[in-house]
Amino acid sequence: MFVIQPVNDSDAPELLLAFQRLIPQLTRNNPPPTLGEIVALLKSDSSVLLIARAEDSSIVGALSLTVYRVPTGIRSIIEDVVVDEHVRGQGIGEALVRRALEIAKEKGAAHLTLTSNPKREDANRLYLRLGFKRRDTNAYIYKF
């Protein structure tokens, strides 16, 4: 059993420890955020950080949702979906994404976008099963 909830300011120290465990499971390209970066994220009006808590209240998953306005409407994007490797396959990722979809819709977003590494086969199957469609577009990145 697990609970999906938004993070509040008092969760920041615990989240710091959880991200030190979770972010390396997601990517080797970026280090876990510092406490200052977590606090800045929590203060952002456009960002919602969702976490999954296990029965023992430990953080076993997280997801970042950004909802923002552009001239053509309200957009939303999911980033950094991660579930602890020890509890994968229990529906935690699905519950996180479903809650993010609800929040984005409540905030007036016309659609929700996400990207996923093709090597993350389970995650890609989940997104397709939840109704996401592959976009016929090029994704670009510019690194500073």
Task: Please report, for each region that a protein language model flagged, where it lies by residue.
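Conserved N-terminal entry element of GNAT/NAT acetyltransferase domains
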Residues: 1-13
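Helix-loop element at the rim of GNAT/NAT acetyltransferase active sites that forms part
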Residues: 10, 19-32
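Active-site rim helix/loop that mediates acceptor-substrate recognition in acyltransferases
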Residues: 30-49
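Conserved beta-strand in the GNAT
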Residues: 51, 58-67, 77, 82
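A conserved beta-turn-beta hairpin within the catalytic core of GNAT-like acetyltransferases
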Residues: 68-78, 88, 135
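Conserved acetyl-CoA-binding loop-helix of GNAT-fold acetyltransferases
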Residues: 83, 89-102, 125, 129
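Conserved active-site alpha-helix within GNAT-family acetyltransferase domains
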Residues: 94, 106, 118-136, 141-142
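Conserved GNAT acetyl-CoA-binding A-motif
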Residues: 97, 104-116
